[in-house]
Amino acid sequence: IAQALLGDPEILVLDEPTAGLDPEERIRFRGIISDLSQQKLVLLSTHIVSDLEAVANEIILLRKGVVLEMQKPASLLEQLNGQVWLITVPAADEAALTKQYTCSNVMHTDGKSVIRLLSKSAPRPDAVPTAPNMEDLYLYYFGR
C-alpha cells in the first residue's frame, strides 16, 4: 500500500487491505483509508463487511464482472427493510429454520436459539422484523 501511494495516484485500488489484520490494526487502517478518500478516489474490494460499514460512501456490488447495484450504503440497506427477521425458538428447532432460510446469525442462550434470517415475508407469526445490516445485504445478494 505504501508503494502504491508513492506516485500519489488519483485513484487507489485496494484489494482486501485489512485481511489478516488484528481488530486494532484494522480500525487504524480504516482511518487511513478514510483520510485518503478525502483526497482521491479509493476503490476497496473486500468481503469484510465491517470495512464497508466503516469507510464506504458508495457501494458497487459485482457478480462475475456484472454490476448488480451501485448505491449509497443506506439506500442498499433500505431495499431489505421488512425482509430481515429475528425468531426465538427452542434450540432443537434451529436446524429446520436455518435449512429453510438464509440465516445471518444465531445466538444461543438458555436452551433457546435467536435466529436472524432473511425472508420476503414473516417466516412465522412470532417473527420480529429487525433493521438490516451489511451482512444481511451480502447474504441477500451472494448467499444461497
What are these regions, as identified by a protein language model?
Residues 1:
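Hydrophobic anchor residue at the start of the ABC signature
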